[in-house]
From Swiss-Prot:
Biased composition (Basic residues): 30-44
Domain of life, source organism: Bacteria
Gene Ontology molecular functions: structural constituent of ribosome
Organism of provenance: Rickettsia canadensis (strain McKiel)
Gene Ontology biological process terms from the UniProt entry: translation
Protein name according to UniProt: Large ribosomal subunit protein bL34
Keywords: Ribonucleoprotein, Ribosomal protein
Keyword Magnesium in annotation: no
PROSITE patterns to which the protein is assigned, alphabetical: RIBOSOMAL_L34
Protein family (similarity comment): Belongs to the bacterial ribosomal protein bL34 family.
Gene3D superfamilies noted in UniProt: 1.10.287.3980
Lineage: Bacteria, Pseudomonadati, Pseudomonadota, Alphaproteobacteria, Rickettsiales
NCBIfam families: rpmH_bact (TIGR01030)
Length: 44
């Protein structure tokens, strides 16, 4: 059986990267929450 996690840095950046987050209002909300929480790493 094929495993569910097949790592790809390109897909990782496109789906969870900073620019992907900034592209949508809900994504910007995620960044806002993570900044408020004090996360050093905001996105993948």
């Amino acid at each position: 059986m094929k495993r569910t996690f097949q790592p790809s840095n390109l897909v990782r950046k496109r789906r969870h990267g900073f620019r992907a987050r900034m592209a949508t209002p809900s994504g910007r909300a995620i960044l806002r929450r993570r900044r408020a929480k004090g996360r050093h790493k905001l996105s993948a």
